[in-house]
Amino acid sequence: MFKRRLKFKGPDKRWVHEEAHIADYNEATEIGRVRLGKLFFFYRDLGVKYYVPYDYIERTFCRVSECHPDDSPAYYYYRLILVHGEKEFANLIFNEKEDVEKILELLKEGHPYIQFGYVEPEKKKKKKFFS
């Protein structure tokens, strides 16, 4: 029977299917749609498996979103945001706050060079059209 080979898309948008990536993916700790390997951070988004080297991640934080359906109580979902070069490159949605907290805790333990928490972006000055 046809066996599907694992392949991953990297931050440079290129596909890889190297044995080092596959072995790290198979041995990684799985939390929701995220896997934390020894070499790479793996996540799924729209059916595509992505890998990110840990040194590519400069900052990470949790963003809480609130939804108010009609005639129902509000519910919350949690977004794990990964940042590189002041740009958010991954926005991973979780239903459970504990999953995001566990991922952040494991990242803090294993990768102390990653910064944690939200930073307000610089406000750009508006151009004056008339003097």
List each model region and its residues.
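Acidic, Ser/Thr- and proline-rich intrinsically disordered linker/docking segments
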Residues: 2-3, 59-131
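Short acidic/polar mixed-charge low-complexity motifs
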Residues: 32, 48, 86-88
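Phosphoinositide-binding peripheral membrane targeting modules
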Residues: 37-73
